[in-house]
């Protein structure tokens, strides 16, 4: 199922107070690789996860990493950025 997301801009919700947005470039047994990524620590802002992601959909991904590897065991959910709804 994750293969459907390869090459797409995605939102990765993590167990920790982090959210990551970027282009899913590779998947293996233990890691997801995102390129042009925004690894955001929600403790650094007063906004909620949902508002941060909705703002990123509206204004674009604020890249702060060329490449980031995320442990699959830390992932709660992954979705295409285009599938985020703001209703």
Walk through the language-model features, giving the residues of each.
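Conserved RNA-binding domains used in RNP assembly and mRNA/RNA metabolism
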Residues: 1-87
């Amino acid at each position: 199922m994750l293969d459907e997301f390869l090459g797409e801009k995605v939102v990765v919700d993590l167990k920790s107070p982090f959210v990551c947005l970027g282009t899913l470039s590779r998947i293996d047994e233990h890691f997801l690789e995102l390129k042009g990524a925004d690894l955001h620590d929600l403790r650094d802002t007063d906004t909620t996860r949902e508002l941060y992601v909705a703002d990123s959909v509206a204004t674009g991904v604020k890249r702060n990493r060329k490449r980031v590897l995320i442990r699959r065991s830390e992932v709660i959910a992954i979705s295409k950025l285009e599938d985020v709804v703001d209703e």
